[in-house]
């Protein structure tokens, strides 16, 4: 029997597919739609210390090859999502979940994580170090010194399962430098990647979205090669205890297969989920299992990370 079951840290999942933070996760109702689908789990909208309305609309647009967005982290505040995942865990349901959070300063991040630490939530936390769409706020994980200092401080008080969502890196030296930092800490996972920041899509003679004069994060088909490269680069560099979640350009079973082949333990779907809805998880799961049957693979472990190079 072909299985797409997987594991992140000590958490087991009956499938390897889930939503990406930002899509189908703003409200409890949206999260429950993902919960009731064939997704293995869900990740919440990235929650900040206070409620945020986000950037002015229009701030999202579908394109021929994916999407562009400058949402600006709209969310209901991290406590809204923390309360929801905590309450859901008490119902006895079997799915572990991911709580996505970030502070707009190191102090805010510490405040958020200390509240989670003191709560009864025992699930996974995804710390978003890579949002490219908050005006005046750089992507934290591009500053290696700041990232190192932030993680060093976090792990002086935070002992629950924690992973980080990363921006895409483009230089081999940066893969080496980032991995050296991440390997110092007891991270449960890294998520590769968030959208490619500050792209520009034009229709006729006008930009598609309003914030930042049309500049926004690029998702979908555009970013799959970059996402695959980041997944594989970190798979080869990180210690085995740090699992990898692959995000970027997944809309078919073949796309998911390639992410896992590059080393991903789990796969998140963003743009295609926004376009197709939660039914996408059933379709992509079937397509992935069909590929596995054709290739004689019974489990993800049979091919994870086994990307072949040319001689």
UniProtKB/Swiss-Prot annotation:
<dbReference type="InterPro" id="IPR013785">
    <property type="entry name" value="Aldolase_TIM"/>
</dbReference>
<comment type="function">
    <text>Catalyzes the conversion of dihydroorotate to orotate with fumarate as the electron acceptor.</text>
</comment>
<feature type="binding site">
    <location>
        <begin position="45"/>
        <end position="46"/>
    </location>
    <ligand>
        <name>FMN</name>
    </ligand>
</feature>
<dbReference type="InterPro" id="IPR005720">
    <property type="entry name" value="Dihydroorotate_DH_cat"/>
</dbReference>
<feature type="binding site">
    <location>
        <position position="220"/>
    </location>
    <ligand>
        <name>FMN</name>
    </ligand>
</feature>
<dbReference type="Pfam" id="PF01180">
    <property type="entry name" value="DHO_dh"/>
</dbReference>
<feature type="binding site">
    <location>
        <position position="165"/>
    </location>
    <ligand>
        <name>FMN</name>
    </ligand>
</feature>
<feature type="binding site">
    <location>
        <begin position="69"/>
        <end position="73"/>
    </location>
    <ligand>
        <name>substrate</name>
    </ligand>
</feature>
<dbReference type="GO" id="GO:0005737">
    <property type="term" value="C:cytoplasm"/>
</dbReference>
<feature type="binding site">
    <location>
        <position position="128"/>
    </location>
    <ligand>
        <name>FMN</name>
    </ligand>
</feature>
<dbReference type="InterPro" id="IPR012135">
    <property type="entry name" value="Dihydroorotate_DH_1_2"/>
</dbReference>
<keyword id="KW-0288">FMN</keyword>
<protein>
    <recommendedName>
        <fullName>Putative dihydroorotate dehydrogenase A (fumarate)</fullName>
        <ecNumber>1.3.98.1</ecNumber>
    </recommendedName>
</protein>
<dbReference type="InterPro" id="IPR024920">
    <property type="entry name" value="Dihydroorotate_DH_1"/>
</dbReference>
<keyword id="KW-0560">Oxidoreductase</keyword>
<comment type="pathway">
    <text>Pyrimidine metabolism; UMP biosynthesis via de novo pathway.</text>
</comment>
<feature type="binding site">
    <location>
        <position position="193"/>
    </location>
    <ligand>
        <name>FMN</name>
    </ligand>
</feature>
<feature type="binding site">
    <location>
        <position position="128"/>
    </location>
    <ligand>
        <name>substrate</name>
    </ligand>
</feature>
<dbReference type="GO" id="GO:0044205">
    <property type="term" value="P:'de novo' UMP biosynthetic process"/>
</dbReference>
<keyword id="KW-0963">Cytoplasm</keyword>
<comment type="similarity">
    <text>Belongs to the dihydroorotate dehydrogenase family. Type 1 subfamily.</text>
</comment>
<feature type="binding site">
    <location>
        <position position="45"/>
    </location>
    <ligand>
        <name>substrate</name>
    </ligand>
</feature>
<keyword id="KW-0665">Pyrimidine biosynthesis</keyword>
<feature type="binding site">
    <location>
        <begin position="270"/>
        <end position="271"/>
    </location>
    <ligand>
        <name>FMN</name>
    </ligand>
</feature>
<feature type="binding site">
    <location>
        <begin position="194"/>
        <end position="195"/>
    </location>
    <ligand>
        <name>substrate</name>
    </ligand>
</feature>
<dbReference type="InterPro" id="IPR050074">
    <property type="entry name" value="DHO_dehydrogenase"/>
</dbReference>
<dbReference type="GO" id="GO:1990663">
    <property type="term" value="F:dihydroorotate dehydrogenase (fumarate) activity"/>
</dbReference>
<dbReference type="InterPro" id="IPR033886">
    <property type="entry name" value="DHOD_1A"/>
</dbReference>
<dbReference type="InterPro" id="IPR001295">
    <property type="entry name" value="Dihydroorotate_DH_CS"/>
</dbReference>
<feature type="binding site">
    <location>
        <begin position="248"/>
        <end position="249"/>
    </location>
    <ligand>
        <name>FMN</name>
    </ligand>
</feature>
<keyword id="KW-0285">Flavoprotein</keyword>
<dbReference type="GO" id="GO:0006207">
    <property type="term" value="P:'de novo' pyrimidine nucleobase biosynthetic process"/>
</dbReference>
<comment type="subunit">
    <text>Homodimer.</text>
</comment>
<feature type="active site" description="Nucleophile">
    <location>
        <position position="131"/>
    </location>
</feature>
């Amino acid at each position: 029997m072909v299985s797409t079951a997987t594991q992140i840290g000590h958490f087991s999942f009956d499938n390897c597919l889930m939503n990406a933070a930002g899509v189908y996760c703003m409200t409890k109702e949206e999260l429950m739609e993902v919960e009731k689908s064939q997704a293995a789990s869900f990740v919440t909208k990235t929650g900040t210390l206070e409620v945020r309305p986000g950037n002015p609309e229009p701030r999202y647009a579908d394109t021929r090859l994916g999407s562009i967005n400058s949402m600006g982290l709209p969310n209901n505040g991290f406590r809204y999502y923390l309360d929801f995942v905590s309450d859901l865990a008490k119902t006895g349901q079997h799915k572990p979940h991911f709580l996505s959070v970030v502070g707009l300063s190191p102090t805010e991040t510490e405040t958020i994580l200390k509240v989670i630490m003191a709560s009864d939530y025992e699930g996974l936390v995804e710390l978003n170090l890579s949002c490219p769409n908050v005006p005046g706020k750089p992507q934290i994980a591009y500053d290696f010194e700041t990232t190192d200092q932030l993680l060093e401080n976090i792990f002086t008080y935070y002992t629950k399962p924690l992973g980080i969502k990363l921006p895409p890196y483009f230089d081999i030296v940066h893969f080496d430098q980032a991995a050296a930092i991440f390997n110092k800490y007891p991270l449960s996972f890294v998520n590769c990647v968030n959208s490619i920041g500050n792209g520009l899509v034009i229709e006729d003679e006008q930009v598609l979205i309003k914030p930042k004069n049309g500049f926004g994060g690029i998702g979908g088909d555009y970013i799959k090669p970059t996402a695959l490269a980041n997944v594989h680069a970190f798979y080869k560099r990180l210690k085995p205890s740090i699992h990898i979640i692959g995000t970027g350009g997944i809309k078919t079973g073949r796309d998911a297969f390639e992410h896992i082949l590059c080393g991903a333990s789990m796969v998140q779907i963003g743009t295609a989920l926004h376009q197709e809805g939660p039914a996408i998880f059933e379709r992509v799961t079937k397509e992935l299992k069909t590929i596995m049957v054709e290739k004689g693979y019974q489990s993800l472990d049979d091919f994870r990370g086994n990307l072949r190079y040319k001689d």
